[in-house]
Amino acid sequence: MSIAGVAAQEIRVPLKTGFLHNGRAMGNMRKTYWSSRSEFKNNFLNIDPITMAYSLNSSAQERLIPLGHASKSAPMNGHCFAENGPSQKSSLPPLLIPPSENLGPHEEDQVVCGFKKLTVNGVCASTPPLTPIKNSPSLFPCAPLCERGSRPLPPLPISEALSLDDTDCEVEFLTSSDTDFLLEDSTLSDFKYDVPGRRSFRGCGQINYAYFDTPAVSAADLSYVSDQNGGVPDPNPPPPQTHRRLRRSHSGPAGSFNKPAIRISNCCIHRASPNSDEDKPEVPPRVPIPPRPVKPDYRRWSAEVTSSTYSDEDRPPKVPPREPLSPSNSRTPSPKSLPSYLNGVMPPTQSFAPDPKYVSSKALQRQNSEGSASKVPCILPIIENGKKVSSTHYYLLPERPPYLDKYEKFFREAEETNGGAQIQPLPADCGISSATEKPDSKTKMDLGGHVKRKHLSYVVSP
């Protein structure tokens, strides 16, 4: 005996389906099969359309309705698939499939699809077990209590009072979209706290308004609107605002059938809308900006200057103009950057004194009393062979003493007297007189050298 036969006898379940060859349909199944006495009565567990709605479409559902209480014996392809005992509970005609060796591809697909869906719902097994397993759970969900290590499945909670519309609503809840729900022409039931629905705990929880498009309205807003309208409702209320459908119930457990709908009156919606004029706060009028205060008088106040004598027409004291700065950044500027003097004559040292226009009278009086204006320094340029050697170097001699004026006056008078007496009596001795005058003039030049230097001090070659 093969391993599959041993496993079949151990589990005591009839092997009703054969092996498929390369995915072929049920018509090409092998002829070898195992059969034994069965412990359970019915192959199919009261398959109702309500149960099959979760996994089958409408066409398959119509096809499988007669299978609810089908017979145990059904001839297929000339082989017996049923159990040995006759059916006692069957009241509907059995499912008959005409035997044919070559089924069309469309018919084969229908047969295989139907049996696959029955296998998903736990009606029959696809293949026999390969090895005997004693303590493992049953491979056949429909196995009886005598099966080792397995427990029967609880019956499905199907109520006869439940209408097909409620079931379709639940199926539609899992399959349809929000757009299809909004297009339905149905009235929404009002939310009830006192009457609990089936499998729901209404009244035990709170409503989460975050799932709704319409905002939550407090009791204060409701009382405010009723007082404002004077207790008179709006004669022409607009249609209620459609809110989006909830995916999960906010008051009951997940998957409750009755979805509550909350309706808020138009006045409440209008009150809570952000675009309404009543919701906007009243803005007080702007306070006029006061004019800028007059700028206080920050001028200097003293006993000598009063407000009457001080006027805006008075001008500040004069400031001496600045001399143009040299473009060079060196600390010792070149002579070319120095100011040029008129006629090439360098002014005396007193020219560096402050300008009398911007100097107080007391300073000028002090300079005049000291005699600084009459004193002139003696500057002698360096001359070689009748030419000035340098324009930057010179001899600075001390001030000319006053007694030299007497010597200069004496030598001038002596020249005039001696020169006129020698030239007149002896006109023929011009050569001798000229020879004698030359040493005399030379001595006069030596004696009056300091006098001549005074005149040379003012001549400076450019």
From Swiss-Prot:
GO terms for biological process: apoptotic process; bile acid biosynthetic process; cartilage development; cell migration; cellular hyperosmotic response; cellular response to dexamethasone stimulus; cellular response to epidermal growth factor stimulus; cellular response to insulin stimulus. Changing residue 358 to A: Abolishes inhibition of EGFR activity. One of its GO terms (cellular component) is plasma membrane. Residues 312-321, 437-448 have a biased composition (Basic and acidic residues). It is found in: Cytoplasm; Cell membrane; Nucleus. Residues 225-374, 415-448 are annotated as: Disordered. It is a peripheral membrane protein. Keywords: Acetylation, Cell membrane, Cytoplasm, Membrane, Nucleus, Phosphoprotein, Tumor suppressor. InterPro entries: Cdc42-bd-like, EGFR_SigReg_Kinase, Mig-6. The keyword Transmembrane does not apply. Residues 326-337, 362-372 have a biased composition (Polar residues). The EGFR-binding region prevents binding of a cyclin-like activator to the EGFR kinase domain, and thereby keeps EGFR in an inactive conformation. Also maintains EGFR in an inactive conformation by preventing formation of an asymmetric homodimer. Belongs to the MIG6 family. Negative regulator of EGFR signaling in skin morphogenesis. Acts as a negative regulator for several EGFR family members, including ERBB2, ERBB3 and ERBB4. Inhibits EGFR catalytic activity by interfering with its dimerization. Inhibits autophosphorylation of EGFR, ERBB2 and ERBB4. Important for normal keratinocyte proliferation and differentiation. Plays a role in modulating the response to steroid hormones in the uterus. Required for normal response to progesterone in the uterus and for fertility. Mediates epithelial estrogen responses in the uterus by regulating ESR1 levels and activation. This is ERBB receptor feedback inhibitor 1. The gene is ERRFI1.
